[in-house]
Amino acid sequence: MPEKKGSSGEKILYCSFCGKSQHEVKKLIAGPSVFICDECIELCNDIIRDEVPAVEAGGKTSRSDLPVPSEIKTLLDQYVIGQDAAKRTLSVAVYNHYKRLKHMADKGKGEEVELAKSNILLIGPTGSGKTLLAQTLARMLNVPFVIADATTLTEAGYVGEDVENIIQKLLQNCNYEVERAQRGIVYIDEIDKISRKADNPSITRDVSGEGVQQALLKLVEGTMASVPPQGGRKHPNQDFLQIDTTNILFICGGAFDGLEKVIANRSEKSGIGFGATVKSKAERSVSEVFRQIEPEDLIKFGIIPELVGRLPVIATLGELTEDALVQILTEPKNALLKQYQRLFGMDGVELEIRPSGLAAIAQKALKRKTGARGLRSIVEQALMDTMFELPAMDGVAKVVVDENTIEDNTMPLLVYREQAKASA
């Protein structure tokens, strides 16, 4: 009851929500036949404050919230070493994409100039940072993100993943919030592996090549995808969630092995004459050749012209040098060395990898041609026995890794606390 009479006959007012009397709270605010106390108001404010960030994240990005290209590149620099040209291209493309969405929301449908979407194609060797760039962008912009492997996709009706499964995974990653999903980022890896197998498309049925490209084309250019609610399987009588993919940013990536030969052959044909500057194939690195890429090269490689046209922004990533790999080991916010130092620190042990050890790790990754992706397995292999035995050992203060540990698989040097004190 909002009000009651006390023993002395005075009218005592009560909070309609928590039931406390006017004597138990600081303030009681009256409304039409209801009362609310200051404590309930504070509780309501806390609830609203907790929900606002989630609403804002799902809502429209304001211009002030959107970092400019130079800020995007600076943030990418903290996680991705090198690849400056690719980072600049990506920063501009992502900024323009979300600026376009803001423009569409502000101007409405009556705007004369319609801004088209610019999806992105990343070309670079294995372990050069393609996936990490896309992941970092999505995390930075606080938008839903999903990675899809193009090699697992098949045409509808065949065994394998349907292309619409990509959108279903995107929805799952944002708790089935349709508005958020429609502004997300999709990264399709190994796009080069679904290239057309022959110049004549009518030779055989290519269920994991050109057919998948055609299916992806619809998603990339914008379509209404039908997705079962909460991850259910499709069946005829089911209600589907309709997702418009028009404003989803698609980033496709691949190593495109052999594309450099296609580009080199074209450039050799065009570079004939007295004024042509000729460089031998041995003098040109793969990254140098990739920088001369034209859409016709991708078509010759086996990507259908329609899909090439829907990926107008092309960013090429170079092969990582030994110095770049050493930087990747030590410099980024989540650098591999920092991660292992933290793991050893949990056992009260300091981990030191000497410069010679870092160089040996980088050289091994270069020999394996695995790029930055192969660094973890090399470090893991070198430290496996130590990590197995260390928790049961007493008195170890420091583990030191040098080039012998990496090259010859010898045990790292263990420094005990007594030795550390004596040397100090």
Swiss-Prot record:
UniProt GO MF annotations: ATP binding; ATP hydrolysis activity; ATP-dependent protein folding chaperone; protein dimerization activity; unfolded protein binding; zinc ion binding
One Gene Ontology CC term in the entry: HslUV protease complex
Xref: SUPFAM superfamilies: Glucocorticoid receptor-like (DNA-binding domain), P-loop containing nucleoside triphosphate hydrolases
CDD domains in the record: RecA-like_ClpX
Residues that hold Zn(2+) according to the record: C15, C18, C37, C40
InterPro entries: AAA+_ATPase, ATP-dep_Clp_protease_ClpX, ATPase_AAA_core, Clp_ATPase_C, Clp_protease_ATP-bd_su_ClpX, ClpX_bact, P-loop_NTPase, Znf_CppX_C4
Residues the entry annotates as binding ATP: P125, T126, G127, S128, G129, K130, T131, L132
Alphabetical UniProt keywords: ATP-binding, Chaperone, Metal-binding, Nucleotide-binding, Zinc
Keyword Nucleotide-binding annotated: yes
Domain ClpX-type ZB: 3-56
UniProt GO BP: cell division; proteolysis involved in protein catabolic process
Superkingdom to which the source organism belongs: Bacteria
Keyword Transmembrane helix tagged: no
Recorded family membership: Belongs to the ClpX chaperone family.
Subunit and interaction comment: Component of the ClpX-ClpP complex. Forms a hexameric ring that, in the presence of ATP, binds to fourteen ClpP subunits assembled into a disk-like structure with a central cavity, resembling the structure of eukaryotic proteasomes.
HAMAP family: ClpX
Record-linked PANTHER family: ATP-DEPENDENT CLP PROTEASE ATP-BINDING SUBUNIT CLPX-LIKE, MITOCHONDRIAL, ATP-DEPENDENT CLP PROTEASE ATP-BINDING SUBUNIT CLPX-LIKE, MITOCHONDRIAL-RELATED
Function of the protein: ATP-dependent specificity component of the Clp protease. It directs the protease to specific substrates. Can perform chaperone functions in the absence of ClpP.
Name recorded for this polypeptide: ATP-dependent Clp protease ATP-binding subunit ClpX
Gene that specifies this protein: clpX
